[in-house]
Amino acid sequence: MLKPLFGKADKTPADVVKNLRDALLVIDRHGTNTSERKVEKAIEETAKMLALAKTFIYGSDANEPNNEQVTQLAQEVYNANVLPMLIKHLHKFEFECKKDVASVFNNLLRRQIGTRSPTVEYLAARPEILITLLLGYEQPDIALTCGSMLREAVRHEHLARIVLYSEYFQRFFVFVQSDVFDIATDAFSTFKDLMTKHKNMCAEYLDNNYDRFFGQYSALTNSENYVTRRQSLKLLGELLLDRHNFSTMNKYITSPENLKTVMELLRDKRRNIQYEAFHVFKIFVANPNKPRPITDILTRNRDKLVEFLTAFHNDRTNDEQFNDEKAYLIKQIQELRV
């Protein structure tokens, strides 16, 4: 007698995960030839089991999710170690199946038992899974799916720390400049989360890795890619103005080279670049303890800067904060003396 193929009642979470693991093992052994019938069937079975797993987690039109079954499913997923296999073979799945992988992964990450987050603990013990997700940005067909899972993971500080302090973190400086707009944007979103979500951890990272980080970051603010340049300038302003990054800000705004770069960006032909550069430039000028090299540059260019700023974005008549800041900068620069 043939078993029913569908129906939540027909399979337990243990059945679903066992079938999923068996299918993934076939792909593991024979996956180099995805046109081989046994691999095709295994990929189909993977998609089918993932859809059932998703039904356990999210429920269906007819049934609400059952917490006991969700807990059982999660435990079976951990015990069977199917998450690394799903991510390893993600590029072989159809679009809907990839989405289901991300849905299941992200939901499991959000699960808590009291103060514990079992999936966070599971991933923390297997950092290679996080690195595989990060390197997913190198493959256009899975980049966005991997990005969504990685962003969900780095919401948890312990997992974010693993990624941030990994040697592979530096790859973000390449990914955010991808020629593929969607990949570059997605990678920057993940990069920004890594640098801003966990304030104390990020401040510590920037303090300990200042030269390396900003040596690479300067390539982003000078990128030929408009979106990369604008996003990186905006993030730079946010990082420098965050009180947690006070020591990093002090170091950054005492560099004459940084000031020269920002002054050049103020004159960029694109208005949005000018505007973001303004919000970095103002930190240099507002610093009450400007070192002599910074004061010298501002003083040497005093008249030109006053003239430039007086005419700068005068159409922003409704932006009261911007106009107040601009007036303050003009006053500060006018008061500089040789």
Curated annotation (Swiss-Prot):
- MF-aspect GO terms: protein serine/threonine kinase activator activity
Name the UniProt key words of this record, in alphabetical order. Answer: Cytoplasm, Cytoskeleton
Give the top-rank taxon of the lineage listed in the UniProt record for this protein: Eukaryota
The transmembrane residues are: none
Explain what the UniProt record notes about the effect of disrupting the gene for this protein: RNAi-mediated knockdown results in the production of additional AVM/PVM neuronal precursors.
Question: Which GO terms of type biological process are on file?
Answer: asymmetric neuroblast division; intracellular signal transduction
Report the subcellular localization.
Cytoplasm, Cytoskeleton, Spindle pole
Q: Which Pfam families match?
A: Mo25
- GO cellular component entries: cytoplasm; spindle pole
Task: Quote the function comment for this protein.
Answer: Regulates asymmetric cell division in Q.p neuroblast lineage. Plays a role in cell shedding during embryogenesis.
Record-stated family: Belongs to the Mo25 family.
The protein here is known as MO25-like protein 2
Q: Which species is the source of this protein?
A: Caenorhabditis elegans
Gene encoding this polypeptide? mop-25.2
